[in-house]
Amino acid sequence: MTTRGTSESEDEIGVKDKKAILSDGGVFETEDDKLRLKSLPENAFILGIETSCDDTAAAIVTKSGHVVSQAIRSQVSIHEEWGGVVPTLAKEAHQIAIDDVVKECLSKAKVTDIGRQVSAVAVTVGPGLSMCLRVGVRKAQKISGEHGIPIVPVHHMEAHCLVARVKEEEWNSESVEIANKNEVAKFPFVALLVSGGHNVLLKVEGVGKYTILGQTLDDAIGEAYDKTARLLCLPVGGGGGPAGPNPRRQLPV
């Protein structure tokens, strides 16, 4: 979904700037941490935190990719009347929700001792709305500092690419159909990222190894959907795409 109220340069932070957003404390992933994480058993718990835009989300995922638990708070009702995500309102909603979302996620996974049961905390550091990203990063820093577990910075778009390596049954989605449900993408593969901010075709050769084959020269498709829905006075709180294909909807004249 597109943002409202401030310019992209003020709101968005790319992964190249992640050192700036991560520079105010916390136990961050070092080379020793990387080696330790690689040697973890397949059933080791990783806590993931996501606050890049207008959803506050957390999940416990095993090293093998099994989703043990997840919790999410949507902000659709907050942004509906504005026709897009308002960064300041999104940040405030994240601040209100983040503690309860993480607590719910840990409870569902029966985690009672983070320091003993969770091996790392992964958190989105960009791209996204900088003021929203900081809410998630600071929560991750707090957990890391209190329990002595490393932080793994996550690139938002890289995560979208690599979800193709998670088995379909883990997605828990009725809107996605896959021909071979028990297969996952094997390196190398081609990934198409289509969202409100990005349209990119990539060759994925491994984790951290990507080649851009092509990308949009202007607006992303998701942004075009949002703008069109807004012009048609359709609700865009959940995105312009879902708002459109409804034959029962009466369009304004």
What annotation goes with each model-predicted range?
Residues 2-45, 51-52, 59, 69-70, ...:
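A short helix-loop
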Residues 72-76, 156-158, 216-218:
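Short, acidic/turn-prone active-site loops that include or flank metal/cofactor-
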Residues 90-97, 131-135, 150-153, 213-220, ...:
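Catalytic cores of large soluble enzymes that bind and process phosphate-bearing ligands
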Residues 117-175:
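Glycine-rich phosphate-binding loop and adjoining helix at the ATP-binding site
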